[in-house]
From Swiss-Prot:
Record PROSITE patterns: ABC_TRANSPORTER_1, ABC_TRANSPORTER_2
Family, as annotated: Belongs to the ABC transporter superfamily.
Protein known as: Uncharacterized ABC transporter ATP-binding protein YknY
Listed GO biological process terms: transmembrane transport
Record organism: Bacillus subtilis (strain 168)
Organism taxonomic ancestry: Bacteria, Bacillati, Bacillota, Bacilli, Bacillales
Topological type in the membrane: Peripheral membrane protein
Length: 230
């Protein structure tokens, strides 16, 4: 489903060029549950941004579901994001003036889905993540775990093939983090491909494959980790 081939990423700042990714090769198949780990500045978030069509590789190719999108323009990338990818972020990214249900409706507005269908699908998504009784609550009336569940509902409401989660438990306590990871595991069991970025080994251990990134390269996992990805 995801194929990065010889992907490099560099940034030009003034006269200096900074290489962030070096010849990344990564395959992730439909239905996999993969974590990307690495220290701060390793390049893991850059890989996530490229997979999520939020950034482009400087060179190399990126195929998503058999479609080479390496050279897509901004408008084309936005269409791919809205059609195929759901996002979950550490800080939830909920609009504070909209209730839970209306926050979940947002991706469908961008997709041009009618009001009645939007409402029905948002309700089903919130029920799926256990928030049937919180649909009309504002974000400031929800706990951290509930906010993240709203974010997950928003990510799945368009039925994407792929969910990308960037440090999804980073702002949560241990018990709430476990509940959120259970939610991802359940979604993956239904066939959704999930890729998450984390620096927490206990979170990565919930996934089926661990991709280790260091200094812009994919490297073998340490002996204490049960899986690696390339």
């Amino acid at each position: 489903m995801i194929q990065l081939s010889n992907v490099r990423k560099s940034y030009q700042i003034g006269k200096e060029t900074f290489d962030v990714l070096h010849s990344i090769d990564l395959d992730i198949h439909q239905g996999e549950y993969v974590s990307i780990m690495g220290p701060s500045g390793s390049g893991k978030s850059t890989i996530m941004n490229i997979i999520g069509c939020l950034d482009r590789p400087t060179s190399g190719t990126y195929q998503l579901d058999g479609e080479d999108i390496s050279s897509y323009k901004d408008k084309e990338l936005a269409a791919v994001r809205n059609r195929s990818i759901g996002f979950v972020f550490q800080q939830f990214q909920l609009l504070p003036r909209l209730n839970a249900k209306k926050n979940v409706e947002l991706p469908m507005i961008y997709s041009g889905i009618g009001k009645k269908e939007r409402q029905e699908r948002a309700e089903r998504a919130l029920e799926k993540v256990g928030l049937a009784d919180r649909m009309l609550h504002m974000p400031n009336e929800l706990s951290g775990g509930q906010k993240q569940r709203v974010a997950i509902a928003r990510a799945i409401v368009n039925e994407p093939k792929l969910i990308l989660a960037d440090e999804p438990t980073g702002a949560l306590d241990t018990k709430t983090s476990e509940a959120i990871m259970d939610q991802f595991t359940a979604l993956n069991a239904e066939g959704t491909t999930i890729v998450l970025v984390t620096h927490e080994p206990e979170v990565a251990d919930c996934t089926n494959r661990i991709v280790m990134v260091r200094d812009g390269n994919i490297v073998p996992a340490s002996s204490g980790q049960r899986s690696v990805g390339e």
